[in-house]
């Protein structure tokens, strides 16, 4: 069977999926991941029917970094029979101002993408590592980069620029938006399950390991809460939209070096910094610590605030969509956010919400509230197949 491999690499985990190809149709064959890299490494994979294919732990020294994790995943994948690899699709967080759609990767493109590492220091180096390795090991297999920023590149210029001298915009200092692969999938999925709403004004809340929100009009991104780097918006693993005066205070008054400020913002901020406990929403909801309650209240407030901002950018709202880990699986968070958006006409059906229904608003709600699982990997696979199937590929 002809197959595609989809790779999503992070600092402490490596996710991969194998899709079978029949014509232009894709069928998911395998889901896998290596997590706990450098601490408690574990390789797991399941078949499409849920059958466990491997569950193996490693010594921390054996899988101490991402390249080692890639090597172990590749070693296992090579034991599989019946697949003919046609291409590899990669999630790349930052495409900068130049990449507005997926692209076949060559050495020039790879060098160009490496130049965006300062724009996404936690993500870009990890995204590019498996690409480099794949190009070395399988130079004849096409590698495709799919960007989290690309879906937002159609924003009007006045929404993406900062009030700085124009030269900074020309250098790439602008609002980009992220989680674009997720939003693109939701836009397509919404056309299937709620076609009327999909043509209107939709606010999507991607509440996963990172969090952001996006305003869609007729399936196109109009505005996003994430800005220049993937550390802004209603996030919980970083401080979100931080007043630049705070950064100046840390440098000028506290005497912190730039790297120390970066470490603070990327590693010690967000809900973990505010609560002193965890970035995991499940831990915070289960805790009776008042700081945990404060962190949850802060997060919900930021989501409600951003929901109102996006509704204003869209000129109103017809539907609201929850997606990603917390958005799909946390009824308490969904309930509190919808309650905060009641002034926009959103009315929650508590029973549907607790049951995890696809539609959790009442029949009389002016805003339809949906819960839709996202599928960034399928979006990457679709883009990859389309690109390698193009006449000039």
From Swiss-Prot:
Catalytic activity: acetate + ATP = acetyl phosphate + ADP
Taxonomy, superkingdom: Bacteria
GO annotation, biological process: acetate metabolic process; acetyl-CoA biosynthetic process
Principal cellular location given in the protein's record: cytoplasm
Record has Acyltransferase as a keyword: no
Involved pathway(s): Metabolic intermediate biosynthesis; acetyl-CoA biosynthesis; acetyl-CoA from acetate: step 1/2
Named cofactor requirement(s): Mg(2+); Mn(2+)
Residues at the catalytic site: 148 (proton donor/acceptor)
PROSITE patterns: ACETATE_KINASE_1 (PS01075)
Marked site (Transition state stabilizer) residue numbers: 179
Residues that bind ATP: 15, 206-210, 280-282, 325-329
EC code: 2.7.2.1
Metal-binding keyword on record: yes
Family under the similarity heading: Belongs to the acetokinase family.
Subunit structure: Homodimer.
Protein name: Acetate kinase
Top-level taxonomy: Bacteria, Pseudomonadati, Pseudomonadota, Alphaproteobacteria, Hyphomicrobiales
UniProt gene name: ackA
């Amino acid at each position: 069977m002809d197959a595609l491999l989809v790779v999503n690499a992070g600092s402490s985990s490596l996710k991969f999926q194998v899709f079978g190809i029949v014509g232009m149709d894709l069928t998911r064959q395998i889901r896998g991941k290596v997590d706990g890299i450098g601490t408690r490494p574990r390789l797991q994979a399941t078949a499409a029917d849920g059958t466990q294919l491997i569950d193996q732990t490693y010594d921390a020294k054996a899988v101490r970094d991402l390249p080692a994790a890639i090597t172990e995943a590749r070693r296992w994948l090579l034991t599989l029979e019946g697949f003919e690899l046609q291409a590899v699709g990669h999630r790349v967080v930052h495409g900068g101002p130049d990449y507005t759609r997926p692209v076949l990767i060559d050495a020039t493109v790879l060098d160009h993408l490496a130049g965006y590492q300062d724009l996404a220091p936690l993500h870009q180096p990890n995204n590019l590592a498996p690409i480099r390795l794949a190009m070395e090991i399988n130079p004849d297999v096409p590698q495709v980069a799919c960007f989290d920023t690309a879906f937002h590149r159609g924003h009007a210029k006045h929404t993406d620029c900062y009030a700085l001298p124009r030269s900074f915009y020309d250098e790439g200092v602008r609002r980009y938006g992220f989680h674009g692969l997720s939003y693109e999938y939701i836009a397509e999925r919404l056309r299937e399950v709620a076609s009327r709403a999909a043509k209107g004004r939709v606010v999507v809340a991607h509440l996963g390991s990172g969090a952001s929100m996006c305003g869609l009009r007729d399936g196109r991104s109009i505005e996003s809460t994430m800005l220049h780097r993937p550390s802004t918006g209603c996030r919980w693993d970083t401080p979100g939209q931080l007043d630049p005066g705070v950064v100046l205070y840390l440098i000028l008054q506290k005497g912190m070096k730039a790297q120390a400020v970066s470490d603070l913002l990327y590693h010690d901020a967000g809900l973990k910094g505010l609560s002193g406990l965890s970035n995991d929403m499940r831990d915070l909801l289960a805790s009776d610590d008042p700081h945990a309650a404060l962190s949850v209240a802060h997060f919900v407030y930021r989501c409600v605030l951003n929901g109102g901002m996006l509704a204003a950018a869209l000129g109103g709202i017809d539907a609201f969509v929850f997606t990603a880990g917390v958005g799909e699986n946390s009824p308490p968070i969904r309930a509190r956010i919808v309650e905060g958006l009641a002034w926009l006409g959103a009315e929650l059906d508590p029973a549907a919400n607790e049951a995890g229904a696809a539609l959790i608003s009442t029949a009389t709600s002016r805003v339809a509230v949906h819960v839709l699982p996202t599928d960034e990997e399928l979006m990457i696979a679709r883009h990859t197949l389309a690109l390698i199937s193009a006449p000039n590929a």
